[in-house]
């Protein structure tokens, strides 16, 4: 099985209604969810020298993630206020903290040499690393979320093996966008559709995966779970539809409890 590292964003999700705080963020979540499949992932991110930063590092270590490159910087750890409305999450105030200045060092790049797959997301200030990582032979994955107007769709996709995004539902406009993304150089584009499952375009055909029917407690981390399950499946030699099915199963597991993990 291939090795995987994530780079970029972390965030402590604070639920005032529950009087609880959960470690999260795309790079953090994807790394943690990969441990469900026997992978010991690495993560490069920045946390503040505050209690939330300490909590996040402890939480990651306890889940089996290599935190040797979770760097502590002077300042505040990124945090988001989250409210639950009918078991769906609604994001409130966001404080980016030390992550606002995140960048990879030369030592970080050297450390990434041991990993086969590198994943990041649009919030992580990591996109500038991907041309170099892709040129070095890494299998690259990036989540642009629902930011369909982002300039990254023009500049980043030639350096991606897997481009992830989200949308409410499948329609002709979405299919045309997906075809254009692969035409610009991405290997595969995969779009999660919430309760409508997911769809992928590999340059030859569309692949669709229905959601699993489970009792939804909290949708936090669903998309990140899908990405982790998918990438772990692909790294183990699964076909595209098999990896999508594993991503769906991973997401179904996550949405049945509060918090990302």
Curated annotation (Swiss-Prot):
Its EC number is 2.7.1.218. Pathway: Carbohydrate metabolism; fructoselysine degradation; D-glucose 6-phosphate and lysine from fructoselysine: step 1/2. Disulfide bonds: none annotated. NCBIfam families: PRK09813.1. It catalyses: N(6)-(D-fructosyl)-L-lysine + ATP = N(6)-(6-phospho-D-fructosyl)-L-lysine + ADP + H(+). Monomer. This is Fructoselysine 6-kinase. InterPro entries: Carboh/pur_kinase_PfkB_CS (IPR002173), PfkB_Carbo_kinase (IPR050306), PfkB_dom (IPR011611), Ribokinase-like (IPR029056). CDD domains: Fructoselysine_kinase_like. Belongs to the carbohydrate kinase PfkB family. Signal peptide: none annotated. Pfam families: PfkB (PF00294). Catalyzes the ATP-dependent phosphorylation of fructoselysine to fructoselysine 6-phosphate. Functions in a fructoselysine degradation pathway that allows E.coli to grow on fructoselysine or psicoselysine. To a much lesser extenst, is also able to phosphorylate psicoselysine. One of its GO terms (molecular function) is ATP binding. Keywords: ATP-binding, Kinase, Nucleotide-binding, Transferase.
């Amino acid at each position: 099985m291939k090795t995987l590292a994530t780079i970029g964003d972390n965030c402590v999700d604070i639920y005032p209604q529950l009087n609880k705080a959960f470690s999260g963020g795309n790079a953090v979540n994807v790394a943690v969810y990969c441990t469900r499949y026997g992978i010991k992932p690495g993560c490069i991110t920045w946390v503040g020298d505050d209690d939330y930063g300490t909590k996040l590092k402890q939480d990651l270590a306890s889940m089996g993630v290599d935190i040797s490159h979770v760097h502590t910087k002077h300042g505040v750890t990124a945090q988001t206020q989250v409210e639950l409305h009918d078991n769906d999450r609604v994001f409130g105030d966001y404080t980016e903290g030390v992550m606002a200045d995140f960048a990879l060092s030369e030592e970080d790049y050297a450390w990434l040499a041991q990993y086969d797959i590198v994943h990041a997301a649009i919030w992580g200030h990591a996109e500038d690393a991907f041309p170099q990582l892709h040129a070095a032979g890494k299998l690259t994955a990036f989540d642009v979320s629902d930011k369909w107007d982002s300039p990254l769709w023009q500049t980043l996709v030639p350096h991606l093996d897997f481009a992830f995004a989200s949308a409410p539902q499948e329609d002709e406009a979405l299919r045309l966008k997906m075809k254009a993304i692969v035409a610009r150089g991405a290997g595969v584009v995969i779009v999660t559709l919430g309760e409508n499952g997911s769809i992928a375009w590999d340059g030859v055909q569309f692949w669709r995966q229905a959601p699993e029917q489970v009792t939804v407690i909290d949708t936090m981390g669903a998309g990140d779970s899908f990405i982790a399950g998918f990438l772990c499946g692909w790294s183990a030699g699964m076909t595209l539809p098999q990896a999508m099915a594993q991503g769906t199963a991973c997401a179904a597991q996550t949405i049945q409890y509060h918090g990302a993990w």
